[in-house]
């Protein structure tokens, strides 16, 4: 049986063997608080590659040490961190998948002992510290840090870069009027609030020629915040700069109630795709092969990002293929166990 979920997908100069992406998820497992890859990361990502995920995306990886969400996050702020990341891409590639990395800065949501930095001195909530409002020099240094991180990503062997512009972290903070109250060229109008991301993309393009994704929070879930229609305009600007795919998540820029249900964010991937003609990724409570297949067949997204379901079962692609009646080409080491997988779901 043919399956769109298991059909190849080419984006720029990279061909994925299927449309399943391991969504970036922080593992908080850099045990020495130095940003380094550990054996856990090698097994964690390598296993999903062996499980036949098409694109394995490494978790939010900090471009500056002070830009980590926690002390145990992965980092890419120094050349001495390349070796561990290169081992990770080798594990992924050797097991048949392409490798991506999400480049990130936590902004005001950095839970470290040092200062947090943000476009404006507004805390996320009353339990978190008041961040330092970034000056122009700090903004320029952060943009340069993203560029250097992109170059290190190339040296580490990654095929795809994703810029983390969602979930209330630094890029998202500049984009949203809820968190950006600046009166200089980086605040005020949508064009000015986009300027930080624009300059990051320009700087990354100088050193990286592979596919670039951007993860967005397509809805602030606040009456004064951004909606998916605002992100249509942002996406048009990103597309003009050469961005290849928009990974459509939502929320977390400010505390808000979100109604969560299966595929609750697919609507954003569909809307962005329809109104900008750019490739999109759908993410959020996508847990079965038939659900993923339907999203693709309905032309609501181009790639399917799987998160917690891959934590529950690193061999999700095999189960999805079984569900869809698709014969999956597995590692030769596993061919002694042919036939259907029986689950209790």
Curated annotation (Swiss-Prot):
This protein's UniProt keywords: Detoxification, Flavoprotein, FMN, NADP, Oxidoreductase
GO MF term list: FMN binding; NADP binding; NADPH dehydrogenase activity
Binding site for FMN: 23-26, 60, 102, 215, 307-308
GO biological process: one example: response to toxic substance
Catalytic activity: A + NADPH + H(+) = AH2 + NADP(+)
Cofactors: FMN
Name of the featured protein: NADPH dehydrogenase
InterPro entries, A to Z: Aldolase_TIM, NADPH_DH_bac, OxRdtase_FMN_N, YqjM-like
UniProt KW NADP keyword: yes
NCBIfam families (alphabetical): PRK13523.1
Organism annotation: Bacillus cereus (strain ATCC 14579 / DSM 31 / CCUG 7414 / JCM 2152 / NBRC 15305 / NCIMB 9373 / NCTC 2599 / NRRL B-3711)
Name of a matching Pfam family: Oxidored_FMN
